Amino acid sequence: MLLPTVPRVRLRSTVRPAIDTPFGPLTFTTAIGSTALPLLPDALFELPGGRTVARWGTPVARVELLLSPYDPGLDPENWGPLTDCRAAVWRIDVLAPIGRVQFGAGLPVRLPEGADAGWDGGQSLAAITVDDDSTRLTVGGNDEEAICHAAGAEVPRRWAELIDEVHDHSHSTWGVDADHRHGMTWTLPPLETGDHCELPVVAAWAPAADETANTWYAALASSTDVLRQVTAEPASAEAVRKC
C-alpha cells in the first residue's frame, strides 16, 4: 500500500488521473494479463500538498497511482530553475500469480502543432523529450537496468537475477518500450503472490531556450525518492483518513 501513514480524504472518482503538462495530459494505463483496468479508479483519495492516490482492485492484484509535486533537488549553482516538475508512483500488490502486467504513461498521440518528440533514454533512465519553440518537457522512469537494481526494495528481489537480459533481449519477455515517442510502456517480469512492484514516472518542463534547466536530470528519480518527499512534509491537521 502506498503511504499508509499519510492522512487522506476520499474523493468522488469522476476524472481520469493525469499530470497536466504543456503538451497535454500525461495519462496512465495498467493491463493485467489481457485485461486493461478502467480509466477511472475504484477509489480516489486526496493527500496533503495537492497530491492524490487512485486505487483499483481486482481478484489478483491491487493497483495504486500516486500523483504528486516533486522537487528533484537540482543544484542551483549548476542548473537553472524548472518551470514545474510532477511525479507519479505506480504500485501493484499481487494477490495471485500474474504472468504479464503492463504499465503505461503517455502524452496525447497528436501533440500540439510545432512540437517534436523523441526518445531520450540513457543509463538507468527510460525517457522521451518533447519540445517546441517555447517549452522542453522530459518524461522519464526506470529503464530495465534500474528495475533490476531496485530489486529487494521497490521490485521483487529475484528480479536482480534478470540483469543479463538487460543487454540481451533475444529471449526476454519484459522491458520498456517507447510508444511512438509520445510515451512508454513497462512490461514486467512474472509476479508471484505477495510480490509488490513500484515504478516512478517524472514529468519536468522548462523554457526551451534555457539549456541550464536540466529536465533530463530532473527525471532521474526512484519511487523511494518521491515517497520520501511526501512523508517528510508535515500533514495537514484537517486531513481525515477515510480508507
Model regions and ranges:
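Acidic (Asp/Glu-rich), glycine- and aromatic
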Residues: 81-129, 196
